Amino acid sequence: MSNSYVLVINSGSSSLKFAVIDSQTGEALISGLGECFGMPEAVISWKYQGEKTEEAITAADHHHQHAINRIVGLMESLGFAQDLVAVGHRIVHGGEKFTSTVRIDEEVLAEIESLSDLAPLHNPAGAIGIQAAMAAFPSLPQFAVFDTAFHQTMPKKAFTGAISHELYKQYGIRRYGFHGTSHYYVSREAAKMLNKPIEQASFISVHLGNGASVCAISNGQSVDTSMGFTPLAGLMMGTRSGDLDPGIIEFLMKKGWSQEKVFETLNKKSGFLGVSGLTSDARGILEAMENGHEGAKLAFEVFTYRVAKYIGSYLIPLDHLDAIIFTGGIGENSLPIRREILGNLKLLGFVEDEKGNEAARFGKAGIIAKSELLNAVAMVIPTNEEFVIAQQSVELL
């Protein structure tokens, strides 16, 4: 076999992202998105050799299956089908059961579905994607890569909530953390860049996108992370509140708010969108700020302050720091946000490398600041979760 390509699938409730990844280089040969599933305007689009194509999905229902069937046709027409060795699925929640990538069988699929209580928006959709891919590619091995798996090395003191232990035993209420595949990838890439064995490297990984989280990594392992039982905890995000006094929920419900309205507000109408009253997009926030928009300025300040607070607190579980790693759409591209976060860390001695910070954008890695006090750097590493999913799938063949 000349190539080892993996079809990587990230299945949402009304969408499906896919890419064919070369498991040796990480190159995406083709990538695409099916969206608006369950609606008349359902479409699938893909990008191949710089050209984008879009098609309507005309079927009345089962849009995940129709999208994956179209992907099969694409693979065959482009000549990739014979080089596909596996299908890798991004699954959001693995609970305590899954600590690493696993080959999917009926038992694993049932376990993923049983964890739907912990991730009601994500795991049922992931299971639908698996079932559709198994029907479309019956002879290909399928693997599940879990967002939570990397964080299963957290010590009890980091993942235990300060509530009745019975709630943990009965319902599994604890910190799980997410973005694990991204934090795993960038920490390995940072260790390579710094020419340091990952087993001896310690990082604070800062994944900033529409969802955002910070992870403390000691000797290559996750020891704490900002997201919690759900991806709602931790940092302020595009539309999510992040950490919040839980008493606010009771307060709003006493004011007549329904449970659904409270959590829709916290998940979809908070964060950048809620504070600015304008947009959930960091680029829109920066643009409005330049035009004197007070809400945008406040959103920028709250966001960068909270990220810096988490970074500072994550020095606690580490015995040394090699680097702060910025990744994710905002972390990789937003120079003003990185600059403000590092400015908030003045006591840690980080001095910006202005040329380095300017250069480390749009897919380029680089060192953007140094601290002589900590003998550490701040750096940008573009994430590549699909590459990890492809690699870890191939490793289990």
From Swiss-Prot:
Matches recorded under SUPFAM superfamilies: Actin-like ATPase domain
Site (Transition state stabilizer): 179, 240
Subcellular location: Cytoplasm
Stated name of the protein: Acetate kinase 2
CDD domains registered for this protein in UniProt: ASKHA_NBD_AcK_PK
Enzyme Commission code(s) on record: 2.7.2.1
Pathway(s) where this gene product acts: Metabolic intermediate biosynthesis; acetyl-CoA biosynthesis; acetyl-CoA from acetate: step 1/2
GO terms of biological process kind: acetate metabolic process; acetyl-CoA biosynthetic process
GO cellular component, as recorded: cytosol
GO terms, molecular function: acetate kinase activity; ATP binding; magnesium ion binding
Positions bound to ATP: 17, 207-211, 281-283, 329-333
Residue sites binding Mg(2+) per the record: 10, 385
EC class of the enzyme, as a word: transferase
Entry-linked HAMAP family: Acetate_kinase (MF_00020)
Entry note: cofactor: Mg(2+). Can also accept Mn(2+).
Function, as annotated: Catalyzes the formation of acetyl phosphate from acetate and ATP. Can also catalyze the reverse reaction.
Subunit-level organization: Homodimer.
Catalytic activity: acetate + ATP = acetyl phosphate + ADP
Residues annotated as binding substrate: 90
Organism of derivation: Vibrio cholerae serotype O1 (strain ATCC 39315 / El Tor Inaba N16961)
Cofactor: Mg(2+); Mn(2+)
Signal peptide: none
Active site per database record: 147
One protein family per Pfam: Acetate_kinase
